[in-house]
Amino acid sequence: MRFVVLGAGAIGSVLGARLAQAGHDVHLVGRRAHVDAIRAHGLRVQSPDREDVVRLDAVTDIATLDSLVDWARVHAVVLCVKSQDTAGALRELARYADSRVPILCAQNGVSNEDTALRLFANVYGVLVACPTAFLEPGVVRTYSSPVTGVLDIGRHPRGRDAFAAQVSRVLSGAGYGSEVYEDITAYKYGKLVTNLGNAVEALCGPNARGGNLDRLAMDEARTVLFSAGIHAEFAPVSALVQVRPVRGERRPGGSSWQSLYRHTGGIETDYLNGEIVRLGRLHGVPTPVNAELQRAANRLVAVGGEPGSVSELDLLRAVVDGRDQPRREA
C-alpha cells in the first residue's frame, strides 16, 4: 500500500519506518530539522533489540509532497500530528488531496475524527498504544518488543469495512498488534481516560504517573463520561505492549513530556484533560483536577518550563483552592 504519514514525530516516524520495512511505499511529512536528517542519513530507529537505518521519502510540507505523488494512488493518509495541530494540517491537505482519500487518525484524543469529517469523506479512528520517543532529529526510539505497539482501527463514527480490515492486516504485517472494532470511538474514550496522566507526568515527572493526582483525574473522567452517557472501552493492550529499555535507558516520558522537553511550543492537554473539562461543563459536573492540570500545563509551555518542574503537592493545593469553580453572582 501507499501511505502518507502526516506528522513525522515519534509515532509517525516509527510507523513510517515499520511500514517501509514491510515493503510499503511511505512518504513522511515532518519538521525541517528531522526531514533534513532523514534525507542526509536515513531514519535511525532504535529498539530494545537492534537499530535500523531506514531510507524514506520525507518532505516538510504538503505543497512539496503534491509535486511528488499522484494522490489518486495514495491509499491512505495517516494523521499523526498532535490534536492542536489537526485542523491546520487537514486544511492544508484538503487543498491538494481528493476528499475521498481515507484519513487514519492515529492520535490521542477524541476530537480529531470529527474535524477530519468536515473535509474528508472516509475517516478512520486509530487507537494508539505505542511507547516511542523522538528526542533529536533523525533518531526515534520504540520501547516495545517484539510487538512495536498496538494500532486498533475502525471507521468513524462507527463501523467495520473491508478497508479497515485491509489496513489492520498491513499493520499486523509491519509488527503491530491491530484489531478492527465496530465502535472505535468507545475505545478511544477509554484511551483518553488513561492519557489524562500525560499531563501529570509532564508537569511532575514520570514518578508521579499512577499517583494520587493521576487517579483523581481519571476518577473525574469516569464520572463525567457516565453523566454524558458516553461509553468507554479499554483495549487489552498490556499483553502485547512489552516496554523494555533501549540502549540501557528507560523511556524518559510520554508524548506530553517530550513536547515540553523539546520545547515545541505546544502541548495537547487541551484535547485530553481539556476534553474532560469541556464535557464536565456541558453536563454540570465539576472537574477541578483536570482543569488545574490543563491550566498548569499550558502555563508551563508559556514560560518555557522544563518537564517535571512542578510539585504534585502544589497542584493538589491548587485543586483544593477551587480554581475551576463557577463564579456566583452577588
Say what each PLM segment does:
Residues 52-139:
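Rossmann-like NAD(P)(H) cofactor-binding subdomain of soluble oxidoreductases
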Residues 2, 25, 102, 122, ...:
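Residues at the starts of beta-strands that form the adenosine-phosphate
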Residues 72, 106-193, 197:
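Rossmann-fold dinucleotide-binding core
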Residues 24, 43, 121, 176, ...:
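Short phosphate-binding/catalytic loops that engage adenosine nucleotides
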Residues 211-330:
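NAD(P)-dependent Rossmann-like dehydrogenase/reductase catalytic/cofactor-binding core
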Residues 200-213:
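Active-site lid/adjacent beta-loop-alpha segment flanking the redox-cofactor pocket in flavoenzymes
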Residues 1-51:
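NAD(P)+-binding Rossmann beta1-loop-alpha1 motif at the extreme N-terminus of oxidoreductases
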